[in-house]
Structure formats: structure tokens, C-alpha cells
Amino acid sequence: MIKVLIVDDEPLARENLRILLQGQDDIEIVGECANAVEAIGAVHKLRPDVLFLDIQMPRISGLEMVGMLDPEHRPYIVFLTAFDEYAIKAFEEHAFDYLLKPIEEKRLEKTLHRLRQERSKQDVSLLPENQQALKFIPCTGHSRIYLLQMDDVAFVSSRMSGVYVTSSEGKEGFTELTLRTLESRTPLLRCHRQFLVNMAHLQEIRLEDNGQAELILRNGLTVPVSRRYLKSLKEAIGL
């Protein structure tokens, strides 16, 4: 079975695609999402083989969302768009294919045929890593979804319950992005196995006798530094 996740902010568009896909014996629709933030979490949890992704969505577009996915778990991307002008850009973002809205059954069948051929070669395909830098981090907290600009990020921490972003004001939000994704796509530096820090917010490095250290940020919060990453942090500030 080919596991499919549909992401589109238009309910009717999701329904139309769902109807077309439900007629395929080897297709399993594992979920539907109305925005990119929901979709990022669904990709991590559901592990779809294929992502049918609308390009034009509010706040975070489909093109932007691709750059936020963990390269290790990125499915095939089939972009959905009402405008042919997005086709070239879609393939620059490592798309497997793109479909123009309204989706035609024959055109969809061609995409599914290609997917089946790829699946016969390997069970799961991971697309090339997108090197585009993230300008913000999508977060949830206090009953809302918001985009935290990189300049406002103080540090990011990983816990048993997930990854959390702390702002310059000390407020904390949950993100579906992994530490690895954030490390590779933002200016945040690794200072500990469970922490990334924004060096623009650094005020002081407090050295400890055991070879470890502690970062004092301008908002007064502290971030641990392990011996493994202390040297690279010193180099980052010219020491």
C-alpha cells in the first residue's frame, strides 16, 4: 500500500482528491490537513509515502513547508496548484510531480503510475535535502499557532515530550520541527545534545571546572554547554 497525506486549506479540494484516490486499491489515505503546521506534525507521526501538498496556503506555503521537513523522513512531494507558473519552482523544491487544479483523473493516474514504479525499486524514498534557510519557526502554545521570527529565538531545547522554542522574552512554544532540521536550516548553533542557541542573544559564557560551561543570555536565562560543543562555540565568537 502507498500511504498518502493530503494537505490543502480548501475542504472541497481535499474532498475531490480524496474521491479520486479512494478508487485506487493500493492507496491508503492516512490523513488530511488544512495547513502546514498540522501537516508537519502529521508527517512525523503518520510517515506517509506521498504528500499531496497545496502550494498556496495561508501563513506557510507548501513550498516553504518542504524546507521544514526532516530530510530523513521526507516523503515524495506532489504539489497541487491552480497556476502553472509554480511548476518550475515546484521542481526546484525537489517535487516528485505537480498537478494543476482542478485535478484531472487521467493526469493523476500518470502520477500514481510513476509512484508505483518508484515503489517497486524501494519501499521508501527520501528526497534530497533542501538547503534553504528558515526565516521563522512555526510554534504552538497558549491555544494558538504562531510564527516566531529567527531574531526572536533565544534557544531551542529537546525533551521527552518534544522540541520547544524559547523566545527572547522567555516565552516557550512547541514546534514539530526536529533539532536536526533546525540545526541545518537556521543560524542556531548546537551547544548540547539537547540544546541549540542563538548566539546573537549571548551575553556571557560561564566556564566550569569540569570542562563544561553555561551560557548566560541577555534575557537572563541560562543554557548548558557540553564539553563536546564548547570549542565550536568559542570559535563562533572568535576565541
From Swiss-Prot:
Q: Kindly list the biological process annotations in GO that this record carries.
A: regulation of DNA-templated transcription
**Which part of the chain is the HTH LytTR-type domain?**
137-239
Q: Which residues form a coiled coil?
A: none
Q: Cellular component per GO?
A: cytosol; protein-DNA complex
Residues modified as 4-aspartylphosphate: 54
Instruction: Enumerate the Pfam families for this protein.
Output: LytTR (PF04397), Response_reg (PF00072)
After translation, the protein is modified as follows: Phosphorylated by BtsS.
Name of the protein this chain belongs to: Transcriptional regulatory protein BtsR
Source organism per entry reads Salmonella typhimurium (strain LT2 / SGSC1412 / ATCC 700720)
